[in-house]
Design a protein with these regions (language model features):
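Surface-exposed coil/turn segments at beta-strand junctions on protein surfaces, enriched
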Residues: 57-59, 85, 99-101, 198, ...
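Beta-strand-rich interaction surfaces with strong enrichment in secreted/lumenal proteins
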Residues: 53, 79-82, 190-194, 203-209
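Primarily extracytoplasmic ectodomains and periplasmic/lumenal surface modules that are beta-strand-rich
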Residues: 11-13, 101-105, 224
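Short Pro-Gly-centered flexible turn/kink motifs
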Residues: 55, 104-105, 146, 207-223
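Short Pro/Gly-enriched beta-strand edge/turn motifs at strand-loop
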Residues: 43-50, 73-78, 186-191
Length: 224
């Protein structure tokens, strides 16, 4: 019941659920879910200039892979995307690689931008759910739950999956607001927990990467 469309930057631009021909929970091709990387005090979104892309599609598994390299930032980002065959959920496995020969602190921002039922009416709600933690976008009978974790080294011999360290929800398209993704530009998110109207949300992972080390993130959007 879920059909996802990706744009030329590998970003979610169509979100059909549960009817592939009718209910698209985005407004247009300019309204997509952004991904950004901040390193050396510079933030770049994948739809900014400077990224070079390659794409693969694995027909046997219905999995796509987007690889994006930014030579200026010396960062590589890879995303493998799939819709589960037995559940209405999008899964993304994101890897971010430090391409330089020294340690760096890297922040990864994942942005969600829904217009539930393709509506511009100010009726959507975005809410942080602390118990999981997760971000819930909902309106009427439609709900989308965003969850994500990063694989973190907690000791010299042990790794474990940990949740994002910051989040925020916001508004766009009213009062000259462009969306909560703008809050990421200084590297820190405000931590707003709920908004009602034309809403979006952002989560952040911050990690230290050694030379050529890879950060691994698992991300999902479950639909109901």
């Amino acid at each position: 019941n879920l059909n996802i469309g990706l744009n030329d930057h590998g970003l979610v631009s169509d979100f059909y659920f549960p009817d592939n021909a009718y209910e698209n929970h985005t407004l247009d091709k300019n309204m997509f879910h952004k991904i950004g990387v901040r390193v050396d005090n510079k933030l770049s979104w994948l739809d900014d200039e400077g990224w070079k892309f390659s794409f693969e599609y694995f027909e046997d598994g219905l999995i796509s892979r987007t690889t994006a390299i930014n030579q200026s930032l010396q960062i590589k980002l890879e995303s493998k995307d799939a819709v589960l065959y037995d559940k209405d959920a999008l899964l993304r496995a994101v890897k971010v690689t430090n391409l330089v020969d020294y340690n760096r602190e890297v922040a990864i921002f994942l942005h969600q931008n829904f217009a539930i039922n393709s509506s511009k009416h100010l009726a959507d709600t975005a809410q942080f759910i602390p118990d999981h933690p997760a971000i819930l976008h909902y309106r009427g009978k439609r709900a989308f739950v965003v969850a994500a974790q990063i694989l973190s080294q907690v000791s010299s011999t042990h790794h474990e999956w940990q949740s994002y360290d910051q989040h925020t929800v916001g508004l766009f398209g009213i009062e000259n607001k462009e969306g909560s993704w703008r809050d990421a530009e200084d590297g820190e998110l405000a931590g707003s927990n709920v908004e009602h109207g034309q809403t979006d949300s952002v989560i952040r992972f911050k990690t230290n990467l050694e030379p050529h080390q890879v950060a691994q993130i698992q991300y999902s959007i479950a639909c109901a």
